[in-house]
């Protein structure tokens, strides 16, 4: 596992979930965070590599990093608004 400098306020496990469920769960989870909070989203769906960055851009959240592990992806998202 890659080391990251981000300390998430919440971790959302979306492994084995297909589009659009990871994006819907991400939207719900980020709505509960304070501004400046960091959400880590873990996904196995390859479509999430396009879907989650598109969602962050559309909603004005900040995608800090995408980490690709052997079996999953980790997205670090900072709540901006």
Predicted regions and their residues:
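Core SAM-dependent methyltransferase catalytic element
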Residues: 74-81
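Short amphipathic
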Residues: 8-15
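Amphipathic, hydrophobic secondary-structure cores in small proteins
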Residues: 17-66
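Short, compositionally biased "basic patch" segments
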Residues: 1-7
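Intrinsic-disorder/low-complexity, polar/charged segments enriched in Ser/Thr/Lys/Arg/Asp/Glu/Gln
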Residues: 9, 36-40, 72-74
């Amino acid at each position: 596992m890659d080391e990251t400098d981000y300390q998430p306020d919440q971790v959302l496990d979306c492994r084995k979930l297909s589009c659009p469920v990871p994006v819907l769960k991400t939207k719900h989870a980020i709505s509960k965070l304070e501004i400046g909070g960091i959400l880590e989203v873990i996904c196995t769906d390859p479509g999430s590599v396009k879907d989650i960055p598109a969602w962050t851009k559309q909603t004005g959240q900040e995608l800090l990093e995408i980490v690709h592990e052997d079996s999953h992806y980790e997205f670090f998202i900072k709540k901006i608004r």
